[in-house]
Amino acid sequence: MPVLEHRHDIRDDVVALTFDDGPSPWTEPMLDLLAAHEGHATFFALGCVADADGADETLRLILESGSEIGNHTFSHPSLPKLDDDSIRDELERAGSVIEEASGTTLRYWRPPFFHVDKRVRKVVSPLGLQEVGCSMMPWDWEWDAARSAAFVIERLQRGSIVCMHDGRPPNEPADLSAPTREASVAAVGMILDAMSRRGLRPVTISELLLAR
């Protein structure tokens, strides 16, 4: 299956919002913002986080809101650095944990750091998951809310896939000076307001694929 990064062939005024590295305490505020704008998103969850106490409740909230969940591997490694068995284990282990916790079947995956090559794709292909890239990704793990929002708003167009973050991966360096995901939440609020003014509707990857 080809990598999905943008849909250029549609007339519907939709944009797919995606969030990586959750679930986390910042996931529910993201869902509240989406609900206020009658929108949905796709949350690419980490298996190691989804396995934590209370994560199943957050995952179910995602689904109950009309949003959906994707596979972001178990431990957020750079997949090309792993052997074939380890790559497969990262996706299968995450899928098992997330599906058991959420009660849904996963259809999409996203490689950590967007690090992927032909070998990785060949290993993952039998799992039947659609790889999802993105049209744009602000450095919301480092930037303040205004900068992240401006980066996205300037580039938004029909069919875009926006990648942001509702959690922190286990291998992210601790930087006490960097914005927390609260900055990401604030940026999403600004982005959704701008989308509303421009008549753009936030949707899941599945909804983007169904757009005309």
Describe these PLM feature segments.
Residues 115, 119-156, 200-211:
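His/Asp/Glu-enriched short active-site or ligand-binding loop at hydrolase and phosphoryl-transfer sites
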Residues 1-78, 86, 90, 97, ...:
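Active-site beta->alpha N-cap acidic-glycine motif
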Residues 2-9, 37, 174-212:
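C-terminal domain-boundary segment and adjacent tail
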